[in-house]
Amino acid sequence: MSEGDKLGSTGVVGIEKAPSRIGENPGRRVLRALAESFPKTVSGGTQLRPGVIRAKVDRSDLYSACRTLKEDLGFEHLTMISAVDYEDRFEIVYHIASYQSRLLIELISTTPKDDPVVDSVSSVWGGANWQERESYDLMGIVFKSHPKLERILLPKDVLYHPLRKDFRG
């Protein structure tokens, strides 16, 4: 491997250098790179439509998968974080864009309702800071290692999270 072909900091070859299979589009190449890098924790790789892909990642590898997406696969912009409240779990949904590859990935991680904790990705994308605080404030999801995890919209002494389905206001 030449000096210019070295692996990225997380050990994955960048999308432009990742070996492609005949006829494989960039979205499928990203999904394959994630699945190969995190074989036990990344699943459900799907191309939703041209330029939009989706994958699920176990919360234990969320931070590492996000670093891989940014540093090795060129996903430079976290466009949004959202949370979905299901009966027994939360899904945290990340929309992450690669403008160079013209791709958007919807990365989904799940956490049980009785342990709503995932790693913060604010050190990967600075824009995650306020979005994680909003999810904490309104849904009660805790983002480990967040630099300032506190309420952003509601008063600091409020004891509830108003967008949770179990909230009775």
Outline where the language-model segments fall.
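Terminal low-complexity/charged segments
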Residues: 1-169
